[in-house]
């Protein structure tokens, strides 16, 4: 007996887009929510991969820079991107929330919150800026699971002192902190805070590394961080890509500060997980929203994301790192009223 197909021509026509163009039906890996932002990837080498970006600090306007980076990575490079924010109890992005409890009112202190961290399980890479957070255990759990997944980790500026909370993470019976993962924690300002700026000088021996493809003229108005004691250097296994020379004043092209030696501001390393995998890690202590007006720094971060996700053959100096809108971030600092920083819904940062 033969099976006779009786589907009409009209029905077949209705199904053709699903057969010929299945990609248009692919959903973003993170559902829409008023608590975060999602950016579907366009065409590009990152098609089918998902980057989570986290903005969770109080000083450097990551609530503006991470959406800019996400939109650029989605539009010009094809990555699906999601931006998660530290929000207050009303669900507003609130950099003005205190880091430390008021003396005598410790019991009233509310932990910080980053909704959506469970979607790190669907991420192929993480780019984050965070500072001195106290997070609930269930949120720390999602972060630790990602840190121990073997997937790439890119930390910017204050990421190396992300948490006041102790991470529920141990290796060989010893507690792991974020500085162990990133290759050093903030110790002090090597440059003069809010007075010096930083010129990024590429390490000559590494100038041909793929992460530095097309990278030039790195400069930012933030100062250099010291992440290791004087007389020592980066921890074993870290490879410096860029040295930060403190400059007098906050204008690109300013004079070197003769009293300040250059220190590493960008390096990469491996992080060996409990399962024996090695995650690619890049730390840039440059990375304020104002720093990320610099196309050289943006390109370095994009290249690092490609490298970490196994797309090093797709790195090119011709790819676009232009922002997709009118990126004019507010100044860094804690004088929120003068700067114009107030709690806002995530949608304001799209």
Predicted regions and their residues:
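Stable alpha-helical elements in mature extracytoplasmic
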Residues: 47, 65-69, 119, 139-143, ...
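N-terminal secretory signal peptides that target proteins for export/translocation
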Residues: 1-9
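Extracellular ligand-binding/catalytic regions of CAZymes and related secreted enzymes
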Residues: 28-46, 64-65, 72-76, 86-87, ...
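Bacterial N-terminal signal peptides
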Residues: 10-24
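An acidic, glycine-rich "communication" segment
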Residues: 47-48, 156-254, 317-350
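Active-site-proximal beta-strand elements of phosphoester/diester hydrolases
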Residues: 55, 241-243, 282-286
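Residue-level preference for short coil/turn positions at secondary-structure junctions
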Residues: 46-47, 121-122, 149, 207, ...
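Helical hinge/lid and interdomain linker segments adjacent to catalytic or ligand-binding clefts
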Residues: 37-43, 52-54, 58-155, 159-162
